[in-house]
UniProtKB/Swiss-Prot annotation:
Cellular component terms (Gene Ontology): plasma membrane
Enzyme class, UniProt record, top EC level: transferase
Cofactors named for this entry: Mg(2+)
Source organism per UniProt: Xanthomonas euvesicatoria pv. vesicatoria (strain 85-10) (Xanthomonas campestris pv. vesicatoria)
Summary of the function given for this chain in its UniProt record: Catalyzes the initial step of the lipid cycle reactions in the biosynthesis of the cell wall peptidoglycan: transfers peptidoglycan precursor phospho-MurNAc-pentapeptide from UDP-MurNAc-pentapeptide onto the lipid carrier undecaprenyl phosphate, yielding undecaprenyl-pyrophosphoryl-MurNAc-pentapeptide, known as lipid I.
An example Gene Ontology biological process: cell wall organization
InterPro entries: Glycosyl_transferase_4, PNAcMuramoyl-5peptid_Trfase, PNAcMuramoyl-5peptid_Trfase_CS
Pathway entry: Cell wall biogenesis; peptidoglycan biosynthesis
Protein name: Phospho-N-acetylmuramoyl-pentapeptide-transferase
EC number: 2.7.8.13
Amino acid sequence: MLLELARWLQQLESLFGLFNYLTFRGILAALTALFLSLWMGPAVIRKLAQFKGGQPIRQDGPQTHFSKAGTPTMGGSLILLTVTLSVLLWGDLRNRYVWLVLAVMICFGAIGWYDDWIKIVKRDPNGLKSRWKYLLQSIFGLAAGLFLYYTADVPAAITFYIPMFKSIALPLAGVSFVVIAYFWIVGFSNAVNLTDGLDGLAIMPTVLVACALGVFAYASGNVVFAEYLKIPLIPGAGELIIICSAIAGAGLGFLWFNTYPAMVFMGDIGALSLGAVLGTIAVIVRQEMVLVIMGGVFVIETLSVMIQVVSFKLTGKRVFRMAPIHHHFELKGWPEPRVIVRFWIISVVLVLIGLATLKVR
């Protein structure tokens, strides 16, 4: 929105040419989302607190979590609102990738909102039935994959790349591309949701991964950097740095209220949508495998649930004291802040490894 105004004003004053730089608008997007979150946060939390009862607490969970009863949930609505406003202000609204990612965020956020609504109104900790949740996620995930496939304007946009082996490029047919896109979008949507079980645990890795994906998006959309780093050149992908920056700013603003002990929980409205956005951006910039590395905390949390379920069904025994794995460490006696910060540290390391793949050939 403001980019179009700046382009017109540039004819009168060259200073407005700054808005043509992605990095400049990315910084403004992050700051806008951050300050909007800090400004709107208290009012949003008060409004959410009017839903009496707050987030239901699992009866089989750690005993320390019962003190969280009544804490407002659906705080992810603050993230979605500030990200959307920031992107509409600073993004190039002629870019199809911007609209796709916003659409994915809103659609998955709607699923999460309904899930949270059931938990709060009906006092059902399980929320929306899994089959309906996965059905809706599948519809939106497949729709995003189909859109990306049929709007691809360069072969690189539908080619599978393996980090550190940049000479290996696997062209994807329609079905295989859409299936991969589906699994990454829906998979990371649920992975972030599983991780969101402790105060601030999910949002900080999300911020870190979003920042790193912003670097990949910027490089992928730049002819010089893409050629130098030997990564796929995806015209228009650079604009995604605006969305990544907005997520980083909104996430830090939300963390201000979500840090231990949390004043508000993100809820499924935030976790499902943010995970889907990370997966979508990774698919667009053709860095699916790098996302698996950088989002390793989300992957580990998901694998712990899968291992727990399979082990119990096959042997009747549980591998972990409780899944996802962050609850396992809680039940081992780790204080909640220790679990959170250590998972953050792991996330920092994994993101740095992911960024290092830019130079490894």
